[in-house]
Amino acid sequence: GATLTQSALYALLDRVRLHETIYKQAGAVHGCALATNEGDTSQILMFVEDVGRHNAVDAIAGRMWLDRLDGADKIFYTTGRLTSEMVIKAAQMGIPFLVSRSGLTQMGFEIAQKVGITMIGRATNKHYLLFTGGARFRSAI
């Protein structure tokens, strides 16, 4: 299966910062991104902000369906917590890598382990916590 490198994760986090426009101006919104996973880099394919974190996820899921995008080589980023619902939605989209700047719930953790999603939380700048799927993550060390 696919692997995610620390360099690609850092590239994603750098690019997400450039996209959070409503959040920078007003706050109180969640952002979600669908990104490529290309070796040592990552490009954002789509970015959605909404007051409801589920709305932002669903907008990306819908766009993936309309554009017939395969999730197997993608990374999903959310500003929201890694809940069971977020993990299930990522699994339904076929995305193996789930990244958030927030934390996780116990149920989200358990489901991610069960379905084989690599889940990374508290991801900001050069800091992150790898919660599940460590075998598919390559750090720079």
What function would you assign to each model-found segment?
Residues 28-29, 72:
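A generic structural signal for well-ordered coil/turn residues at beta-strand boundaries
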Residues 30-37, 121, 129:
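Short beta-strand scaffold segments in enzyme catalytic cores
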